[in-house]
Curated annotation (Swiss-Prot):
<dbReference type="InterPro" id="IPR016484">
    <property type="entry name" value="GTPase_Der"/>
</dbReference>
<protein>
    <recommendedName>
        <fullName>GTPase Der</fullName>
    </recommendedName>
</protein>
<feature type="binding site">
    <location>
        <begin position="56"/>
        <end position="60"/>
    </location>
    <ligand>
        <name>GTP 1</name>
    </ligand>
</feature>
<feature type="binding site">
    <location>
        <begin position="295"/>
        <end position="298"/>
    </location>
    <ligand>
        <name>GTP 2</name>
    </ligand>
</feature>
<feature type="domain" description="EngA-type G 2">
    <location>
        <begin position="177"/>
        <end position="350"/>
    </location>
</feature>
<dbReference type="Pfam" id="PF01926">
    <property type="entry name" value="MMR_HSR1"/>
</dbReference>
<feature type="domain" description="KH-like">
    <location>
        <begin position="351"/>
        <end position="435"/>
    </location>
</feature>
<keyword id="KW-0690">Ribosome biogenesis</keyword>
<dbReference type="InterPro" id="IPR003593">
    <property type="entry name" value="AAA+_ATPase"/>
</dbReference>
<dbReference type="InterPro" id="IPR006073">
    <property type="entry name" value="GTP-bd"/>
</dbReference>
<keyword id="KW-0677">Repeat</keyword>
<comment type="function">
    <text>GTPase that plays an essential role in the late steps of ribosome biogenesis.</text>
</comment>
<feature type="binding site">
    <location>
        <begin position="9"/>
        <end position="16"/>
    </location>
    <ligand>
        <name>GTP 1</name>
    </ligand>
</feature>
<dbReference type="InterPro" id="IPR027417">
    <property type="entry name" value="P-loop_NTPase"/>
</dbReference>
<dbReference type="InterPro" id="IPR015946">
    <property type="entry name" value="KH_dom-like_a/b"/>
</dbReference>
<keyword id="KW-0547">Nucleotide-binding</keyword>
<dbReference type="InterPro" id="IPR005225">
    <property type="entry name" value="Small_GTP-bd"/>
</dbReference>
Length: 442
């Protein structure tokens, strides 16, 4: 499982700045998608080929008893309990405060690995700063400047070092597509899981991963193997009752990251909520294949169905790549078609795309609609090849590609997805410009 890094600390020590620094490499991928709402308290980051999840808690006051500060502290407590590593941010310019001491005492009792991060350390004597915060009793502090990026890469490498690389974890399993079933509480996720698995089929075993291992549950439907990625507590035999389900954003995000295909469950009786859109946005952000299951379809009338379709068209327009299915998890209606789309989305996400055909498709797109000029230069797209899968990544080489507008990128995405029938998976396009080595010479 990809490590979960939780940022804690009192207000105004730079948690949000560090969060943005840790997640910026992935944020840019979908920031321009129309209609996409984003919860800025969580995100994904990457260093080299290592992915990780980052959670930004609000200013943490462990002794707050009521009001909004108490609610913020309660939410931070849940994040701390589910963290693999805690980054305890303190302010190097302000020095150690009684509030820092209170948080440190709380974190010592939490039983999670903690790294003390001294932020705003630019221009300060690192040895003096480290000595001041060493007294917190949480190990040697690490000084950084989140605003300037100084020391951040070393911090991430230190944090990720104890965790196995992604390929080591994935090598431990070979049981078909990894499927995560996600959604907000009481939409029917547990009913769908039980319908897919059957009580007698639940076989749980730990995948090697972090200190809080995921559970992989293999199951078979229609003669095909699948693996359900479970981080939400489906660890015992028997039914998992929706009434006792406890929604956890972090566990949902972890399941999405571990999956090849995500099934997002919606409730036909309810309008699309911000939480639904946030989960869908994170699926897109991570590049996972997606199938949307509209549950309890049999329990609503035609008026409600029409209203829901309008609501989805407005709030989930950024999921145009995904298939939507009307199902009844309780009656097991629509399940076969749902799994067929899971198979199709997985196949699309893992597609091998030939370089000659990619290049021909790109050239046909340019002939139909050339990229707009930027200043005096018109971009020239020369050839394309595949750069990755799950999601498929297409790398385009050429000249003057640094300022391709987002609208043209989306045009290319649609063209490639239609040409290669990539239904069910998002697509990434990367541009590689051949820079003129003589451009800066007199």
């Amino acid at each position: 499982m990809k490590p979960t890094i939780v940022l804690v600390g009192r207000p105004n020590v730079g948690k949000s700045t560090l969060f943005n620094r840790l997640t910026k490499t992935r944020d840019a991928l979908v920031a321009d998608q129309p209609g996409l709402t984003r919860d800025r308290h969580y995100g994904v980051g990457r260093v080299g080929d290592r992915d990780y999840l980052v959670v930004d808690t609000a200013g943490f006051d462990p002794v707050a008893k009521d009001g909004i500060m108490h609610e913020m502290a309660r939410q931070a407590e849940q994040a701390i309990a589910e963290a693999d590593v805690l980054l305890f941010l303190v302010d190097g310019r302000a020095g150690r405060t009684p509030h820092d001491d209170q948080i440190a005492a709380h974190l010592r009792r939490a039983g999670r690995p903690v790294v003390v991060v001294v932020n705003k350390a630019e221009g300060l004597d690192r040895a003096t700063v480290a000595a001041d915060f060493h007294a917190l009793g949480l190990g040697a502090p690490l000084a950084v400047s989140a605003a300037h990026g100084d020391g951040v890469k070393a911090l991430v490498e230190l944090v990720l070092a104890p965790f196995p690389a992604d390929d080591e974890v994935e090598a431990a399993e070979d049981a078909g597509p990894r499927v995560a079933i996600v959604g907000r509480p009481n939409v029917g996720k547990s009913t769908l899981v039980n319908t897919l698995l059957g009580e007698e089929r639940v076989i749980a075993f730990d995948m090697p991963g972090t200190t809080r291992d995921a559970i992989a549950i293999p199951f078979e439907r229609g003669g095909k193997q699948y693996t359900l990625i479970d981080t939400a507590g489906l660890r015992r035999r028997g039914k998992v009752f929706e009434a006792v389900e406890k929604f956890s954003v972090i566990k949902t995000l972890q399941a999405i990251q571990e999956a090849n295909v995500v099934v997002l469950v919606l409730d036909a009786a309810q309008d699309i909520s911000d939480q639904d859109a946030h989960i869908a946005g994170f699926v897109l952000d991570t590049g996972r294949a997606l199938v949307v299951a509209i549950n309890k379809w049999d329990a609503v009338d035609d008026y409600r169905r029409a209203r829901l379709k309008e609501d989805m068209a407005r709030k989930l327009a950024f999921l145009s790549f995904a298939r939507f299915h009307q199902i009844s998890a309780l009656r097991a209606e629509g399940i076969a078609a749902l799994l067929k789309s899971v198979d199709g989305a997985y196949a699309a996400a893992m597609s091998n795309l030939s370089t000659p055909r990619l290049t021909r498709t790109m050239q046909a797109a340019v002939a139909k609609q050339a990229p707009p000029r930027h200043g005096s230069a018109r971009p020239k797209l020369r050839y394309a090849h595949q750069g990755g899968m799950n999601p498929p990544v297409i790398v385009i080489h050429g000249n003057a590609l640094d300022h391709i507008p987002n609208s043209y990128v989306r045009f290319l995405e649609r063209t490639f997805m239609e040409a290669f029938k990539l239904q069910g998976t998002p697509l990434r396009i990367q541009f590689r410009t051949a820079h003129n080595p003589y451009a800066t010479k007199a």
